[in-house]
Amino acid sequence: MTLVYQSTRDAQNTVTASQAILQGLATDGGLFTPVSYPQVDLDFDTLKDASYQEVAKLVLSAFLDDFTPEELDYCITNAYDSKFDTPAIAPLVKLDGQYNLELFHGSTIAFKDMALSILPYFMTTAAKKHGLENKIVILTAT
């Protein structure tokens, strides 16, 4: 069963995950959110030794269920690679008795690298799924 995403402004405005990725915003100006949230069963004993990429596959496969496992693997493997200055991608570091998730190891040293590293792979994969051949441009600013 394919997970359906609806606009925050009109629950009748629904799309698949790949359509939401391509559209960005709903035609009514709303954001797309899942109609229902999938249950993601995560075994913490397994997760503690898993790579960032492995955890990403587990979580994203539940929310992007119209992507094949091969498509997700392609997106994740290419997005979270040596562009980051640590193999952990987003290490959890203990400092003064508190744990901090470091989201600054990407090319721009900003948390946005976490999302913007995978976005072009999601968009080009979604475009192929829908037979679109237009050039995709992603413009960002800090």
What annotation goes with each model-predicted range?
Residues M1-T142:
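PLP-dependent amino-acid enzyme catalytic core
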